Amino acid sequence: MNPDNTIAVITETIPIGMQFDKVYLTTFNMWREILSNTIKTLDISSFYWSLSDEVGTNFGTVILNEIVQLPKRGVRVRVAVNKSNKPLKDVERLQMAGVEVRYIDITNILGGVLHTKFWISDNTHIYLGSANMDWRSLTQVKELGIAIFNNRNLAADLTQIFEVYWYLGVNNLPYNWKNFYPSYYNTDHPLSINVSGVPHSVFIASAPQQLCTMERTNDLTALLSCIGNASKFVYVSVMNFIPIIYSKAGKILFWPYIEDELRRSAIDRQVSVKLLISCWQRSSFIMRNFLRSIAMLKSKNIDIEVKLFIVPDADPPIPYSRVNHAKYMVTDKTAYIGTSNWTGNYFTDICGASINITPDDGLGLRQQLEDIFIRDWNSKYSYELYDTSPTKRCRLLKNMKQCTNDIYCDEIQPEKELPEYSLE
């Protein structure tokens, strides 16, 4: 495969009703493009399946129907999905259509879940991003991902991660991965590709460390390296930012690695840091305190800012939707697109992956991701940490209707904390 033929495209889902001056190719259209061009094989790693539409458009149903038709065209389809305690009707339909399915019990193996979301088509084309196999991810949840076409080398490397999941569907965790599914590329030896005539260095990282086979870069290592190598700025857009590990016993442990690297970059190297964190009705109150702590560092010589991103509600409201679910970072050098929230457990016992791309000219895909971040940061959907919100969508901001003229709306009385794992 000639690496000069590689095509890479940023994709996103903009929830119905939100308005931006510039948007990129939709997740729905990209998935359809991949499905229509799949000839021999399709591998999908997924958290759960809920494509059968419940409200509004039939986008999810369209995708599900097209996947169901693939075996009839002679396409071998494999689906690795997190083992659930309740039946997944969509998955049962896939199995009836001839799709090979393995339920991956990461809870039993590591105590976490299979949270990775990616596709591999014909061992040549890939998609990786925040979107779940859920109709909401096509119309009601803000998502971001990347599709890369015509690169067998990168597809083969991502397939090695899929094979790890596929193996765990019927086997226990091996003593070590020395003889299993080695990585072809990593942070020290990235793959060189040309996208639109521009050379890019790219590699795929995986989490947690226990599932990183020989030569595979751990996702946390890739993330910290991305921050540490920045010279001018680090822009982050994630659903959750909580430097905590939640234990099975109900205890919490401080997990400072990402936060420390961000603080160090802003203070020691005067790198501009911007955090755009999602806020909705299920946001954790403890996250607000950590974000305020970071934001308080801003001063004459420390450029660090935090905003909350609120997706307006639907009418009528739709459960588990209307939130910015993206998980990416962009610096002046590198684009990082992942599948994990920035909470400790997502790097210690939950399965995730990321694509790390560095263009030689500093532009290309990295520039596109920067443009998306700045668009969202400056939009009417972004709020300061001490703002009041015109909607009840954000659990961490005071609603305007709750404020009086003589009381500054600052403190919020915390409600009972919600479970850490919900939509995410």
Curated annotation (Swiss-Prot):
One of its GO terms (molecular function) is endonuclease activity. The keyword Repressor does not apply. Keywords: Endonuclease, Hydrolase, Nuclease, Repeat, Viral envelope protein, Virion. Induction: Expressed in the intermediate phase of the viral replicative cycle. The keyword Hydrolase applies. It is found in: Virion. One of its GO terms (cellular component) is viral envelope. Pfam families: PLDc, PLDc_3. CDD domains: PLDc_vPLD3_4_5_like_2. PROSITE patterns: PLD. Its main location: virion. Belongs to the orthopoxvirus OPG042 family. DNA nicking enzyme that cleaves extruded cruciform DNA at its tip. Probably nicks viral hairpins. This is Virion nicking-joining enzyme.
